[in-house]
Amino acid sequence: MNIYDQLQAVEDRYEELGELLSDPDVVSDTKRFMELSREEANSRETVAVYREYKQVVQNIADAQEMIKDASGDPELEEMAKEELKNSKVAKEEYEEKLRFLLLPKDPNDDKNIILEIRGAAGGDEAALFAGDLLNMYQKYAENQGWKFEVMEASANGVGGLKEVVAMVSGQSVYSKLKYESGAHRVQRVPVTESQGRVHTSTATVLVMPEVEEVEYEIDPKDLRVDIYHASGAGGQNVNKVATAVRIIHLPTNIKVEMQEERTQQKNRDKAMKIIRARVADHFAQIAQDEQDAERKSTVGTGDRSERIRTYNFPQNRVTDHRIGLTLQKLDSILSGKLDEVIDALILYDQTQKLEELNK
């Protein structure tokens, strides 16, 4: 099937979906209605661009016909030639855009995410940088109109974060933040540095798509659930009733502890949401590693321990090492203006996939 047959098939299916979504039987079936609505939304842009492309093709045919009929009318002929020239340029642009739109979609792109940030090498300075990254993503989410909820945070005593887990909810969150997983390096002079020397520290970021219970079922026999008293500053028990929850997935030894909420059930629900995402991500990463062993990985699926970005404070510089992008906009980026970086990563990823497809 060539590209035009594929595009026509997408348009035919889009029209079929429009009819199905107005069918009372489909509307009354919530699960099916949501699935078909998602499918329609995913193909909407492709269909819109394809229809514009077909109009441009028609414009070319009309202009060619006009040139034939314009003998003896130089002004009309010149106008038709200009229309033909512009339409041919537009046709090439639409064809390029359609090739990208036909690339296989990541099924997780529309999902919410679980975001984990940990201070790594560098002690207190790494924990402070983890806090900076949290603030950066929080502001970026705000700019995108997403909901950002800190689910669990572990402070280090100097205003930094040893670890933080957040849920980011909204439209196409994973499609934009999936490239953030990896090691983020910071180069700056710590407040405690009397000699003015630049120190290097690292924080790690992990982005996982939210996994619904119906999508990934964990056998209850594989879980150990401990209930205990939540502790406050200094380790004292802050609740008379045990509300804190620890869940361990025995086959992988993945552990989640939750004590932020006031009730055991709410802590359990949040812990299950995180552990479901972590376990699903664990097995997805194993499968991805096997796949990457056979072919070169794209930017979106690199080694989780790979250093992906450096934030250099003295030079106000941010460098993304995967695509060789350097921007002298550190202040702006840390204040949540990540669009230029993320757009470049998406374009690079799509270009790599297109090259892979054309091999």
UniProtKB/Swiss-Prot annotation:
Gene: prfA
Protein known as: Peptide chain release factor 1
Protein function: Peptide chain release factor 1 directs the termination of translation in response to the peptide chain termination codons UAG and UAA.
Modified-residue entries (N5-methylglutamine), positions: Q236
InterPro entries: PCRF, Pep_chain_release_fac_I, Pep_chain_release_fac_I_sf, Prokaryotic/Mito_RF, RF-1
Post-translational changes noted in the entry: Methylated by PrmC. Methylation increases the termination efficiency of RF1.
Top-level taxonomic group: Bacteria
Coiled coil: none
GO molecular function: translation release factor activity, codon specific
GO cellular component: cytoplasm
PROSITE patterns documented for this protein: RF_PROK_I (PS00745)
Keyword entries, A-Z: Cytoplasm, Methylation, Protein biosynthesis
Family: Belongs to the prokaryotic/mitochondrial release factor family.
Subcellular location: Cytoplasm
